[in-house]
């Protein structure tokens, strides 16, 4: 079994994520593989920045949040060609985004961002990208 770990730049653009797919397919012909992916390039920083905006009571967090949703949706629209797979993925990703939005709203309301909450927020980057990659490959 081989573990393939891909960092943010490997899942940061359409070109790089399609390259990731080819690498995984080639390795899977030789042996079993486990794929580990980071958040889409730049998303971890965006998640943290959006956390800070919410903590400060700045409603700009909503704009930044929607920009993250749009980026993931555009990636899905571009790389997932099967209509059923794409719709199922949108449902799955949007459910995660609803959870994340609730966490941000809580941070915004109570003006508190514990380390545990921040870790939970950051985890959404990998959770979202792994769903996209799993559907792609």
PLM region spans:
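Nucleotide/pyrophosphate-binding catalytic subdomain
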Residues: 1-136
